[in-house]
Amino acid sequence: MRALFLHSNRIKVIARQKALKEADQLEKPEFDVNKEHLAVFVAVEHGDNLSVAEQLVEEIKKVLEKIGIKEKVVVLYPYVHLTNNPSSPKLAKEVLDKAYDLLKSEGFEVYKAPFGWYKEFEIHVKGHPLAELSRTIKPKKVKKEEGNKVYLIYDGEKEYIIVGKKDKILVKDYKEIENKEKLHFELPKDGIELPIPINQDFEKMVLKEVFSEGEEIEKNPLNDVAKKFGFEWEPLSDYGHMRYKPYAALMVDLVNDYSIKIAKELPFPVFIVKGTNMFDLKQGPVAEHAKLFGERMYEVQSDKSVFVLRYAACFQQFAIAKDLTLSYKNVPFGMLEVADSYRFEQPGEVVLAFRLRKFYMPDLHVFTKDLDEAVEQFLNMHKKIMEEIKKIGRDYELLINVASFEDYEKYKYIIEQIYKDVKKPLLLAIYPKSDQRYWIINIEYHIIDVLGRPREIGTTQIDLHNSKRFGIKYIDKDGSEKHVIILHNAILGSIERYIYALFDTALRKEKPVLPFWISPVQVRVIPVSEKYLEYAEQIAKELESKFRVELDDRDETLNKKIKDAESLWVPYIIVIGEKEIKNNKITVRDRYENKVYETSLEDLISKMEELQKGYPFRPLYGPMKLSLKPANL
């Protein structure tokens, strides 16, 4: 908030023309205060909240005391021109009304210039050193009074309340709470007393989600792996922004391609879109949806307005969907954008290639006709998410967030279906009821990384509210208009998090290796010496139309060349020397089988084609010859 305090003898205000729909209702179009008073010109700014009204009143009292005004006469004047970053008119009006009421309650004689009107005014300001003062008032952080979440472990038909040491229940206000069996999680980790078997990964997720155990570890092998493949912090940008060197850029684009491929294989039409990453916070639907992210909003000021940088593709896809003419015949359908996304994570919380302020999200929204269809597709999306993580040899632990206790009772049948699919305990977080939540059920899919920390990768949600907020409707069979129900889905998670999961999976193997399709270098051809370079280049050129192949033509020893290829986890290293040329064979160091063997080039090509089948392909993002590549690129 910006405030200008003017010690005045007189102010006359006349409302001339209504400017805003939120404008005050006028009792009188003008007032004239012809006595000593403090005129307070106020601009409420974006990011303020109602707490600034109380702070404004305190500043008014301080200024009156500082100037030495004995009469408690104050004129409040809304004056947006004090800032280039104004709040919404709704909030500005609420702040001014609250300040007015607070001053009245403390015995002040208060006048308020009408809000939302074009006005003319005359003012006579005194001429002493303290007659004109200004203040910038910062809002206090307002904690949401949501009560406590209820944490349950759901195991088939049974529910177990999670309690901590000394039976301190972490939940309250959950009906029939005493009818639930209790799980005693003793902290610190000195054992868990459980009536049901759970695996270690699930236990770690519970300890992290419920008890906030498990800090980031500075020495993280996953950081070293990410850097090796070219994922780095960009020091010339903001916290949490990365740069992507050629191998990293290639991997990101391959996951981009793969996310589109699997979306197009779903059993309904999926449309690929693109759009902007900035949305106007003065627009009602945008402002309402943005509130859900609070301090994690990434904002940009322009000459037009204050914009929020999107944290997924919701805004753009909903903005497109609201303009469509939809029939029941068009629904269900999906909309996908691999969206550059922004979240204002705290500097100390960012994690290379995982928790970022800017990342890429293959964000898929599915628009359905009704709840039955939404639940059907929700279960399909769940199965697809589980299928994709199993392709890389992993499994997820599930945290299911439920919007309210009422929703838990109403939609428990969905959770039962999820349980029947995964056949293992689920962690449920049941929230107190709130109008702020747009979803009724929100599933987070977690892996546990090599350091024992839960890492959310995929997600799916049922959204009952945004179609009404944005006005997304279809015409039903009977000719009536109905709002769609929306599913939010990240089948792979963000691109960076999916790659993080691939790195984490690779580190668990005897010899770390990535899936063939996403290995930035799939084959490296190494001549034993310069004498065999020409033949090695012929081999490389024969492969490069189908595979990403590099030729190590550097003036280095054979051992050095092999070591460098091994450090990059290259799946197939082909060594070419006198024996290979003479026998018309190649010697292959096979990282998947952890073997060295002789084979024909044709047999190796067949093996690699089988590994590549069903996945996207892109060529190298650099030259084939390593001699042309700068060091550290």
UniProtKB/Swiss-Prot annotation:
PROSITE patterns according to UniProt: AA_TRNA_LIGASE_II
Entry keyword annotation includes Cytoplasm: yes
Catalyses which reaction(s): tRNA(Thr) + L-threonine + ATP = L-threonyl-tRNA(Thr) + AMP + diphosphate + H(+)
Cofactor(s) needed by this chain: Zn(2+)
Annotated binding of Zn(2+), by residue: C314, H365, H488
Keyword Cytoplasm included in the entry's annotation: yes
GO biological process: one example: threonyl-tRNA aminoacylation
Protein localization: Cytoplasm
Superkingdom classification of source: Archaea
Cofactor details (free text): Binds 1 zinc ion per subunit.
Family affiliation: Belongs to the class-II aminoacyl-tRNA synthetase family.
Known partners and oligomeric status: Homodimer.
Listed name of the protein: Threonine--tRNA ligase
Biological source species: Nanoarchaeum equitans (strain Kin4-M)
Organism lineage: Archaea, Nanobdellota, Candidatus Nanoarchaeia, Nanoarchaeales, Nanoarchaeaceae
